[in-house]
From Swiss-Prot:
Subunit note: Homodimer.
The protein's Enzyme Commission number: 6.1.1.23
Stated name of the protein: Aspartate--tRNA(Asp/Asn) ligase
UniProt: L-aspartate binding residues: E171, R217, H444, R481
GO molecular function: aspartate-tRNA ligase activity; aspartate-tRNA(Asn) ligase activity; ATP binding; nucleic acid binding
Record field: catalytic activity: tRNA(Asx) + L-aspartate + ATP = L-aspartyl-tRNA(Asx) + AMP + diphosphate
Functional note: Aspartyl-tRNA synthetase with relaxed tRNA specificity since it is able to aspartylate not only its cognate tRNA(Asp) but also tRNA(Asn). Reaction proceeds in two steps: L-aspartate is first activated by ATP to form Asp-AMP and then transferred to the acceptor end of tRNA(Asp/Asn).
GO cellular-component term (any): cytoplasm
Enzyme class: ligase
Positions annotated to bind ATP: R217, D218, E219, Q226, E474, G526, F527, D528, R529
Alphabetical keyword list: Aminoacyl-tRNA synthetase, ATP-binding, Cytoplasm, Ligase, Nucleotide-binding, Protein biosynthesis
């Protein structure tokens, strides 16, 4: 039906008969001469038709998004008529034949216009997908999936599918539940991850497993979250952290080569505590410096009791400083006010600062600091004339969070981030447990191997866990798993999952661990998030063919939707009104 894709045509084809097919992107009638921009997956080419052509009458019928097959000779555009914005901007096709394969209603959205309301784009997603940019995204997505399969297969991994209909074993988010028609009153759960099945595959001697897995989580959505998503999932037997990290680094190196980036190995490694203390995040963006500096000791003799008391409680409190070079000339009073309002959203009670000026140090904190304290702050932060040093003080968790966010906000405001840089990082030595209102829960998941389970302070127990971070975004992570029943029971006890509950929820796993489970570990990389970063897309919804909204609904199909009474009866379900 066609001889070329639109953008395959070049100056070397001038004089040749060309046949192309696609959609009418734009239509123009200039004094009797008709111009049609034809669009296919590759891009645009201009068709031109004058009244002498036998295709002219048909060309007059064409409107936006009509499906066309066109035949004609390629020629150079006239002087001054080239379009440098198009790959085919120097040539056009003089129409000899034109077939309208299908007509189109007036499109409710402009194809390729990202400023169109997103809800409207999602409602007509099949039109939104017609843009060449969308095609390039899904072409790359397909290529990355193929690279993943080839790379892992070469390393001896087997691609094995794990069940979609499974048992509910909550991993932090809510499960999506599927009622069983055969087993009245019982439910399957859609998997939040293949975690337990891939561990069972290791018990079964599969040694190295992977799949590009579909996962489901019923949780509140954010810009980078979807209720159903895809991850590159893998597990290895007889391995340690270094083995797993090596596989991930090799895989990411191969993947990013596809978009022309050479990334070096091994990736930098940073302990969790260092990431939190120096950057206020467990996924720090290292494309710029701006570290957080601990200055609690500079406030020990502060005349302000609030600051001095915080300084004397280093276990639970923090006083962090952020020195922004040259900010005194760049940040007006209104900008400083905006930054204060910004951190208040995340629990800050205000934003104290010192301005380092030619005639001395200014700012609301000066009166509370001794001369020695001020001197120490300048030494610790490296502050010079023209700088502004911001301070956060209070509860450790809150201060680290809002100062980390302030760090990012300042970097964005001052354009300190190299948008073309790729900064990979491993964050390691995560805490095994996190405190909640009802005790403790597993920071990653309860199947992670702890490093020092006998430590009396539960908050000091670390996990054999690791996250891979790119430019401040968590790409994925993994851990070495527990492979002995006794250790698994100990971890369950720490998070108040006692024997009866453990057997009810995870009895099949505990049983499997009795039969010679090998040491094993693995990882998962968020596939959608990876493609979002590689394509520099604004939202994860741009890289999923038919995504859900932030309210977990599909505007295209109107899912979820009610079901009829007969279906409910078959499933033994009665709805309360």
């Amino acid at each position: 039906m066609r001889s070329h894709f639109c953008t395959e045509i070049s100056e070397k084809d001038v004089g040749k008969t060309i046949k192309v097919a696609g959609w009418c992107n734009t239509y123009r009638d200039h004094g009797g001469v008709v111009f049609i921009d034809l669009r296919d997956k590759s891009g645009l080419v201009q068709l031109v038709c004058d009244p002498s052509s036998k295709a002219y009458e048909k060309a007059l019928e064409v409107r936006s998004e009509f499906v066309l097959v066109a035949k004609g000779k390629a020629r150079l555009r006239g002087p001054g008529l080239e379009n440098p914005k198009l790959k085919t901007g120097k040539i056009e096709i003089v129409l000899e034949e034109l077939v309208i394969e299908n007509k189109s209603a007036t499109p409710p959205i402009e194809i390729g216009n990202k400023s169109v309301n997103e809800d409207l784009r999602l409602k007509y997603r099949y039109l939104d997908l017609r843009s060449p940019n969308s095609y390039e995204i899904f072409k790359l997505r397909s290529e990355v999936a193929l690279i993943t399969r080839n790379t892992l297969a070469q390393k001896g991994f087997l691609e094995i599918e794990t069940p979609i209909l499974s048992k509910t074993t909550p991993e932090g988010a809510r499960d999506y539940l599927v009622p069983s028609r055969v087993h009245e009153g019982e439910f399957f759960a859609l998997p939040q991850s293949p975690q337990l099945f891939k561990q069972l595959l290791m018990v079964g001697g599969m040694d190295r497993y992977f799949q590009i897995a579909r996962c489901f989580r019923d949780e509140d959505l954010r810009a980078d979250r979807q209720p159903e998503f895809t991850q590159i999932d893998a597990e290895m037997s007889f391995c340690d952290e270094n083995d797993v990290m090596g596989v991930v680094e090799d895989l990411l190196q191969a993947i990013f080569k596809a978009i022309g980036h050479t990334i070096s190995k091994p990736f930098k490694r940073m302990p969790y505590k260092e990431a939190m203390e120096n950057y206020g995040s467990d996924k720090p963006d290292l494309r710029f410096k701006l570290p957080l500096i601990e200055v609690g000791d500079c406030f020990m003799d502060s005349s302000n009791a609030i600051f001095s008391n915080i300084a004397k409680d280093p276990k639970n409190k923090r006083i962090k400083a952020l020195n922004v070079k040259g900010a005194d000339a760049l940040f007006s009073r209104s900008v400083l006010k905006e930054l204060e309002e910004f951190v208040r959203q995340f629990g800050a009670k205000g934003l104290a600062y010192l301005q380092i000026k030619e005639d001395g140090i200014k700012g609301p904190l000066v009166k509370f600091l001794s001369e020695k304290g001020l001197k120490n702050i300048l030494e610790k932060t490296g502050a010079k004339t023209g700088d502004i040093v911001f301070f956060g003080a209070g509860d450790k968790k809150i201060v680290l969070d809002y100062m980390g966010r302030l760090r990012l906000k300042v970097a964005e405001t001052l354009d300190l981030i190299d948008k073309d840089a790729l900064n990979f990082l491993w964050v390691v030595n995560f805490p095994m447990f996190e405190k909640t209102e009802n005790g403790y829960h597993a920071a990653h998941h309860p199947f992670t191997m702890p490093k020092n389970i006998e430590c009396e302070d539960i908050e000091e127990i670390e996990a054999h866990a690791y996250d891979v971070v790119l430019n401040g975004v968590e790409l994925g992570g993994g851990s070495i798993r527990i492979h002995k029943e006794e250790m698994q029971k100990k971890v369950f006890e720490k998070i108040n999952i006692h024997e009866e509950e453990a057997q009810k929820k995870f009895g099949f796993l505990l049983e499997a661990l009795k039969f010679g489970a090998p040491p094993h570990g693995g990882f998962a990389i968020g596939f959608d998030r990876l493609i979002m970063l590689m394509t520099k897309s604004h939202s994860i919804r741009d890289v999923i063919a038919f995504p859900k909204t932030q309210k977990a609904s599909c505007l295209l199909t109107n899912a979820p939707s009610p079901i009829n009474e007969e279906q409910l009866r078959e499933l033994h379900i009665r709805l309360r009104k």
